[in-house]
């Protein structure tokens, strides 16, 4: 089973972000998307620490220590980009002004519930950040995650067992094996990578999947 690399996943998500979109890239894996957005598309990247017009990762030696994203990673600012207060940034997030946010996840349920801030372990450090605000405020919520954990457990589940970030908020999931939409009738597989069959994907996924072509012809 050949999986996409982290950068290949970021490239795949970048292809689906439309011209003119206002997008927040969550901490961790989603920040890689900034490096693969096509130069001929005008896309506005937002960071909750107070940036709009964020660009890709700077080249080695060109880092500005005062220009970072919410994950404390060095970023660049595109022409026309701006800075603003943290409170204003969260008003943008909560007010429905972002078209898309891309978040990581520990689990996503078949109905689109999101769990991405705690595993519930007694020694876990709660770190919800702005994820709850994004989950309810963005018009579309995309999730980037590995299909399986290191222990081989699928992250797409019937019901989340970890503390929830948002209920029914996820629109689409990008894993290292497939692209899956969350619909009213359940998860719909839009794309499978590297020759994996639908049957093989279903075998490792503990929720009922529908293949997009079958769903559209029904």
Short names for language-model regions:
Residues 1-78:
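N-terminal active-site beta-alpha-beta segment that forms phosphate/nucleotide-binding
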């Amino acid at each position: 089973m050949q999986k996409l690399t982290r950068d290949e996943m970021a490239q795949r998500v970048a292809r689906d972000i439309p011209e003119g979109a206002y997008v927040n890239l969550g901490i961790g894996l989603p920040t890689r998307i900034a490096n693969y957005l096509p130069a001929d598309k005008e896309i506005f990247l937002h960071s909750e620490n107070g940036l709009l017009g964020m660009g890709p990762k700077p080249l080695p030696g060109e880092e500005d220590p005062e220009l970072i994203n919410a994950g404390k990673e060095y970023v660049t600012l595109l022409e026309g980009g701006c800075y603003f207060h943290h409170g204003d940034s969260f008003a943008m997030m909560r007010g429905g002004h972002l078209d898309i946010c891309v978040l990581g996840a520990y689990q996503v349920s078949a109905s689109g519930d999101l769990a991405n801030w705690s595993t519930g372990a007694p020694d876990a450090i709660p770190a919800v950040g702005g994820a709850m605000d994004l989950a309810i405020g963005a018009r579309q919520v995309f999730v980037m995650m590995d299909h399986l954990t290191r222990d081989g457990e699928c992250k797409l589940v019937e019901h989340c067992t970890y503390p929830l970030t948002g209920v029914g908020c996820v629109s689409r999931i990008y894993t290292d094996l497939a692209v899956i939409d969350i619909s009213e009738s359940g998860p719909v597989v839009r794309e499978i990578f590297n020759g994996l069959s639908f049957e093989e994907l279903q075998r490792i996924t503990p929720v009922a999947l529908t293949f997009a072509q079958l769903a559209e012809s029904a």
